[in-house]
Amino acid sequence: MVTAPYFTLCTTEQMFLDEIAELKWHKTTWAPANGARTHYGTSEDGELTCVVCIKDASEHAPIPVAGLLVHEAVHIFQRWCDDRGEHTPSHEFQAYSIQRISQELMEEFVRQTGGAK
């Protein structure tokens, strides 16, 4: 069975600060430079942990938000592959993995914000 890394979405700086406190990470900068950013760390049991931040989400239309979240999902997948030493994942594995991560990020975005305006 293949397992994905732990990942979560933060749509506000306070959510980010709460999440990194819970993860026991050293303080890091919240502000996504280009609308979104993924922070990486390691859990207490040594597993990859990813915190995706999206800034000013209420100002984005739904399509650009989806694009940003897919972009960050690709980075999560790439980092997870690197972490596992998987340098040649099959195209189908890549597609399904990125789809799953993207969909979960989008569902969480809608849950937190009620959807983009």
Tell where the protein language model's regions lie, with residue ranges.
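Short helix/strand-bridging catalytic loops that position acidic/His residues to coordinate divalent metals
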Residues: 80-88
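Non-catalytic terminal regions of proteins
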Residues: 1-35
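Post-HExxH zinc-binding segment in Zn-dependent metallohydrolases
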Residues: 88-117
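Generic recognition of cysteine residues
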Residues: 10, 50-53, 81
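Acidic-and-aromatic substrate-binding clefts and catalytic sites of carbohydrate-active enzymes
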Residues: 59-60, 85, 95
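Active-site recognition of the HExxH zinc-binding catalytic motif
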Residues: 67-79
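Active-site scaffold of zinc-dependent metalloenzymes
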Residues: 23-63, 76
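Short, conserved micro-motifs enriched in small and acidic residues
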Residues: 63-64, 68, 89-93
